[in-house]
């Protein structure tokens, strides 16, 4: 369990091998980590009777990472008024710009 308990049952899935965050993990190690995530998440959901769950991996300080060892947060959700706030601000799409960004990512 995460000692901060953003919501009751807030759990961390942590690999034994050290990686700063998911961005440093090789595919095999990431696959091993994420093979466990649904199994543990299902148990947390069953045990807590939560209505939903956020599954979060913060990568680097600007994204909220404060512990620099890879870990995945499983945050049970009970209502929209709990202590976890994640806001995605929708923007009017510029499809030309989206195509440019997609092409840049594809070629990276």
Model-derived regions: residue spans:
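HIT superfamily nucleotide-processing domains
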Residues: 1-108
